[in-house]
Amino acid sequence: MSLYLKAEKIQSWRVLIMACAGFIFNTTEFVPVAMLSDIAQSFDMQTADTGLMMTVYAWTVLIMSLPAMLATGNMERKSLLIKLFIIFIVGHILSVIAWNFWILLLARMCIALAHSVFWSITASLVMRISPKHKKTQALGMLAIGTALATILGLPIGRIVGQLVGWRVTFGIIAVLALSIMFLIIRLLPNLPSKNAGSIASLPLLAKRPLLLWLYVTTAIVISAHFTAYTYIEPFMIDVGHLDPNFATAVLLVFGFSGIAASLLFNRLYRFAPTKFIVVSMSLLMFSLLLLLFSTKTIIAMFSLVFIWGIGISCIGLSLQMRVLKLAPDATDVATAIYSGIFNAGIGAGALFGNLATTYLGLNEIGYTGAALGLIGFIIFITTHLKYRHTFLLQNK
């Protein structure tokens, strides 16, 4: 094997490790969605109230993403990743032993702190450690890792939670995180901070209207998705009257849609980025609009969830890629802001879902999400038409 091929193989393994890291970070962020009922029962709470775990986690990421990124901006990236994994593991140990809901929330905030920095640096790191001619594919691999969190992480987390308790699910995530940390220590090279940006980057980014409106679009569209997705488990059981085992299968289908979205992104996005985003947003809106209707048959629900998953996964990939394109001189800071705003959308969506469930009824979460999605869609189209020449100039 030539030295070039050997080096490329090592680089591919490094990308795979980061994809695995993305897998566990995404798993732990969303696995409560699959266990809300069990956690609520454990602490003698209403399911809608335990859904606020998602809000607290997401808003911790929102608040901490930029300050934590600026504080660690000059740190060597491998050592930073190791420190993040230590915080992540400690948070999960605390989740396992949590003796009341408030301690569990504290543990989730600890994990969210690690999350806030991890996702701020990961996309740019993956592109740095990947083979030169496989940058987009590397980002797609990272996306597959996060999609697998939905395919494997959420359903398995739910099954484990049902069999032996939700605490064991968090314990298993801690063990997996420890294993990945050892692989990072072993295989990743030292990675000096590069094009991370600093506090001086903020005024420059603030002068890029297309980027700012992209952040606004992100917040609204992600809120739309999580208004319904946060409460998908009780929706399927209480509104759709599905057996809990079928509810697990629906989550599995949602995860497989993420793999399909990653493949579509790799093949199609580079040819027509804006059209790709528009179609993805349309899929999300129509899926949310038809969510209640899909409960009439199991096939309809499975089909709709698959399309819904493709839409939201493609949106996440596309918007992140566009942020990197619009801020090549301050990738980590721009991505930190994106990560914070993305999680603001998660938190807001969980809150909107809670309000919709409380005041309108659980069956209305799809319509509420669709209305938000329409607002985000209109903002994206309007700003693209206004600033499309700027985007074309920046991508020549």
Curated annotation (Swiss-Prot):
Entries under PROSITE patterns matching the protein: MFS
A GO molecular-function descriptor: transmembrane transporter activity
InterPro entries in the cross-refs: MFS, MFS_dom, MFS_Efflux_Transporters, MFS_trans_sf, Sugar_effux_transptr_put
Q: What is its main location?
A: membrane
State the Gene Ontology BP annotations.
Answer: transmembrane transport
Q: Which GO terms describe its cellular component?
A: plasma membrane
TM spans (from-to): 15-35, 51-71, 84-104, 109-129, 137-157, 168-188, 209-229, 245-265, 273-293, 297-317, 333-353, 365-385
What does the similarity note say? Belongs to the major facilitator superfamily. SotB (TC 2.A.1.2) family.
What this chain does, per the record?
Involved in the efflux of sugars. The physiological role may be the reduction of the intracellular concentration of toxic sugars or sugar metabolites.
Tell me what this protein is called: Probable sugar efflux transporter
Instruction: Read off the lineage from the record.
Output: Bacteria, Pseudomonadati, Pseudomonadota, Gammaproteobacteria, Pasteurellales
Q: Which gene encodes it?
A: sotB
